[in-house]
Regions:
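Sec-dependent signal peptide recognition
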Residues: 2-8
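C-terminal, active-site-flanking charged/polar segments
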Residues: 17
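Sequence-structural signature of mature extracellular/luminal beta-sheet repeat domains
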Residues: 20-358
Length: 358
């Protein structure tokens, strides 16, 4: 159900009037990821094969105070021919508390949709005013968003029993099992997704690899990218790009959605490994690395890095002409009251691919 309540979000502060009060919406126990949920052990105890033990999340349990840490600096990028002109600057267009702001995608009116993990909702942001409307609530710790060429909207849900939820044209669970068992049985963490034009969805589960849910929601698994994180299709949907640690890998995509020919596409140069990705109208690939957006040609040639704020873990094209690159930024102590997030934006020469939201 869509909410007509509007969150008035100040550009550099946390202030809102929403269906969820900040005291509850950003409480660490409000919307848990599966690995944080005390009920996880009961679910995995019923798996036919126990999933691998999950390592502790770096930074979890630190920075116990709730005081906001200093916001990361906004570096000034150099020019990259055809991509970004010299003299452009990042600006903050949204900021709030918690482990929020993930999976950004463009809307046709120039706004940005994004998911809030801790708050468990999906919001629509007008970057010009900082006003954000809650579109969907109760998302079971929603993360990545994707809209197919046909207009269907999907969300990667990271809570216990999560997987792929369809939000539009009707809201329903699309896929959350593999070979008859919950996705918790494969191990890892649901991370990102991309929807194709045939009605299926590719899902990256960090620690488990790449999965494809066909139009009926039946899932197949593809090995070779155990650290799968960001995931995006090429313009013609014949290539699937997946960030896998310090590299980007690619698969050939077949008419039935199956994947073959896993190969290394490019090595990342900046930051802490690859995360969310986007493509532009010329087929270039942009990958968030934790401190930059690394840019590659369609052939896999490294074209340069657009340095961004420390903690930038996802990118998307948006704006009325789709020539603005938006970045999502996390800083502070992960899983603690000091956690903070931002959405930042910078104008580019390049234009995002118009045939899909991302």
């Amino acid at each position: 159900m869509k909410s007509t309540l509007v969150a008035a979000v100040l550009l550099a502060t946390a202030a809102a009037a929403t269906a969820q009060q900040p005291s509850s919406a950003f409480d660490r126990g409000h919307s848990l990821q599966a690995f944080q949920d005390p009920g996880l052990s009961a679910v995995t105890a019923r798996c036919k094969t126990p999933p691998p033990t999950r390592p502790a999340r770096p930074g979890a349990g630190t920075a116990a105070g709730s005081e906001a840490p200093p916001a990361p600096a906004l570096p000034k990028p150099d020019a990259i021919p055809g991509v970004i002109a010299a003299g452009q600057n990042w600006k903050v267009v949204w900021a709030w508390e918690g482990n929020n702001a993930d999976g950004p995608i463009a809307a046709e009116d120039g706004s940005i949709l994004f998911a809030n993990n801790d708050a468990g909702n999906v919001m629509k942001l007008d970057p010009a005013t900082g006003l954000a409307t809650i579109l969907f609530d109760g998302t079971n710790t929603g993360g990545g968003l994707s809209r197919s060429k046909n207009g269907a909207l999907f969300l990667a849900t990271r809570g216990l029993g999560g997987g792929i939820e369809q939000l539009e044209p009707q809201r329903r669970m699309f896929a959350n099992t593999f070979q008859g068992e919950p996705l918790e049985c494969v191990g890892g963490s649901v991370n990102d997704l991309v929807a194709d034009a045939r009605g299926g969805v590719y899902l990256a589960i960090s620690g488990a690899g790449v999965f494809y849910a066909n139009p009926k929601g039946v899932m197949s698994r593809y090995d070779g990218a155990p650290n799968a994180n960001g995931i995006i299709l090429s313009q013609d949907e014949k290539t699937l790009y997946v960030t896998n640690g310090g590299v980007v890998v690619a698969f050939d995509v077949h008419a039935d959605g199956s994947l073959t020919n896993l190969r290394e596409f490019g090595k990342l140069r900046g930051g802490q490994g690859g995360d969310g990705a986007a493509i532009d109208s010329d087929g270039r690939l942009y990958v968030a690395t934790g401190a930059s957006a690394d840019v590659f040609s369609p052939a896999g040639d490294f074209l340069g890095s657009i340095p961004g704020p420390r903690g930038m873990h996802g990118v998307a094209f948006g704006g009325k002409d789709k020539k603005t690159l938006f970045g999502i930024v996390f800083y502070g102590g992960w899983g603690t009251p000091s956690a903070r997030n931002q959405i930042v934006a910078i104008p580019l020469l390049a234009k995002g691919y118009a045939g899909r939201a991302k």
